[in-house]
Regions:
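Positively charged n-region of N-terminal signal peptides that target proteins for export
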Residues: 1-9
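Bacterial N-terminal signal peptides
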Residues: 8-16
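A residue-level marker of the well-folded mature domains of exported/periplasmic proteins
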Residues: 21-363
């Protein structure tokens, strides 16, 4: 009887040990992913990529972002809450480049790796951002300028002081690094193309509008070509639509040749103001104006397919999310990490169904 009891006790202890060990093994590293939002299709694709990486690398993640990309303080609170959960690493897409500096100093002091995604944090404390997973936004927007220039070059060359022309760049805000880079990339590339490939020069160009997008070396005295940098009153859809409508109201008077919308929100604003883009072709006032968008979504894809837009720039949001979590995991494991360019491509009605493009343009 005693022998049987000893055996039973031993079995119970062994079973408890096994269960305890399994419990320990099942505890996964936790990575906090703090996004700029979840409201746009773009962020849903980023989230899918992040979740896939979490599955592949055996980590638990939370993915959260504020209701609107103007809710900077809400994002800061989300980051604070995530830090309180003791993550092994953090992936961050900062809405405002200066709003999270204190938190980044804390993570650096605590040795918590932070990976930037979608946009960087230029003023971040040195060493606090371990790597970034993002599109080269400056180059991607430069691609948009090149595509637009091909179509409007002749009309630019015809510009005069008596009849100047205007190119409009619509940016959702003037604080996010990704949008700032896009606006500046389009601006600089268009200036370079006009200066090098037409009879005009930089002295004929003026960059006007939101001062965050006017560099110290931007031409501001020209009177033949105006590049206007527009930022809506807020990131709200109504403000994006109102800003787009204000531009459309001046197409004839300002001789606007083209509009570049630098993200999905500004695209949606323009589409809302033009009956999903149909007015851009049905109204003779807009028919010769060139529009290029950014990212995708069902409505934007439809505008490209129907040639309301010349085309759009697509990123790879799935890879942005995936690489953000992958880099965060590798940093936690002590591996060396570096910036990853997740790429961008121009798509139009002719190539949007090609295999290398189709998988990037989400609905």
């Amino acid at each position: 009887m005693k022998k049987t009891l000893v055996v039973l006790v031993a079995l119970v202890v062994l079973a408890s040990t096994v269960l305890f060990a399994e419990g320990v093994q099942e505890k996964k590293p936790y990575i906090a992913v703090v996004s700029k939002g979840e409201q746009h299709d773009f962020w849903q694709q980023v989230k899918l990529g992040a979740n896939a990486a979490a599955e592949d690398f055996g980590v638990d993640i939370t993915f959260e972002g504020p209701p609107s990309e103007s809710d900077v303080q809400i994002q800061v609170e989300m980051l604070n809450n995530a830090m309180a959960k003791n993550p092994v690493a953090i992936a961050l897409a900062a809405l405002n480049t200066s709003s999270v500096l204190d938190q980044l100093q804390q993570t650096k002091n605590q040795g918590i790796p932070v990976i930037g995604f979608d946009s960087g944090v230029p003023e971040a404390p040195e060493g606090s951002i371990w790597a970034n997973a993002s599109t080269n936004n400056y180059a991607a927007a430069g691609m948009a300028a090149e595509k637009m220039f091909e179509v409007i070059k002749g009309r630019i060359e015809s510009a005069s002081i008596a009849k100047p022309v205007k190119i409009v760049v619509m940016n959702q805000d003037a604080s996010g690094e990704s949008l700032l880079s896009r606006g500046k990339g389009f601006r600089d590339t268009m200036i370079k193309l006009i200066d090098e490939k037409t009879a005009l020069s930089k002295s004929d160009i003026s960059v006007i509008g939101n001062t965050a997008y006017i560099a110290s070396d931007s031409p501001t005295k020209g009177r033949k070509v105006f590049i206007e940098m527009i930022v809506p009153a807020s990131a709200a859809m109504t403000d994006a639509t109102n800003a787009a409508q204000a531009v459309l109201n001046k197409v004839s008077s300002d001789n606007i040749l083209g509009i570049f919308c630098s993200n999905e929100a500004t695209v949606k604003g323009l589409l809302a103001a033009t009956n999903d883009g149909a007015t851009l072709k049905s109204n003779a006032t807009f028919r010769d104006m060139v529009v290029i968008g950014y990212d995708a979504g069902a409505a934007q894809k439809n505008a490209v397919r129907n040639q309301y837009f010349l085309g759009s720039i697509t990123q790879d949001p799935y890879q942005i999310g995936y690489k953000a979590v992958e880099l965060a995991y590798k940093a936690y494991k002590g591996e060396s990490v570096s910036d990853v360019d997740t790429g961008a491509k121009f798509y139009n009605y002719q190539n949007m169904d090609d295999p290398d493009i189709k998988g990037l343009i989400y609905d």
